[in-house]
Amino acid sequence: MTGEVRRKKILQMLQSQPEPMSGTALAKEFHVSRQVIVQDIALMRAENHGILSTNKGYIYRSDAVRDERPKRVFYVRHNTEQVLEEFLTITELGGTVLDVAVEHELYGQIRVDMLIESVQDARDFSEKLSACKDNPLKVLTDDCHYHTVSAPSEKLLDLIEAELRDKGLLL
């Protein structure tokens, strides 16, 4: 199978899957290494296919490039134990955590898609973080980081901002 054919099949699989698919699962499906899948995804994203890479795997979002919901970037600082509190604050008010970013002195901005859309997503991420040996990106910048958050309205973004501020999470 050529790379082009494989990429078309990967895209079809992701478009038909409502849940994220891991790079490992895709690699097994197509009998290639995970690195080949990572390269295929990078090529498809360069062609503006709406593929997001989240902590749960790859997901196709037809609205990923054209998400028209209001967005706001929040600059926050908290310890690892407060990650769940932060995400619950956002999701319980109807927000979605689209990504996390840090400003690294050497590498510049490092940004990772998250797509935390619900209370359950927040809890799942928190459990995964607790079980994981790796540290979150925020440890690179003394716990300071950015989240792009979308919500159905500017009013909800205002409420999210106020709640994050009241909880001492917003810088």
Residue ranges and their predicted role:
Residues 1, 14, 31, 77-78, ...:
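Residue-level marker of alpha-helix boundaries and capping positions
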Residues 1-28:
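Extreme N-terminal segment that seeds HTH/winged-HTH DNA-binding domains in transcriptional regulators
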Residues 5, 21, 32, 53, ...:
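Conserved active-site and cofactor/substrate-binding residues in soluble primary-metabolism enzymes
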Residues 8, 12, 28, 39-42, ...:
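Solvent-exposed alpha-helical segments within well-ordered globular domains of core cellular machineries
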Residues 20-53:
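N-terminal helix-turn-helix
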Residues 28, 58, 104-105:
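Conserved beta-strand edge residues that scaffold enzyme active sites
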Residues 68-171:
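Mid-protein regulatory/catalytic core that forms ligand/cofactor-binding pockets
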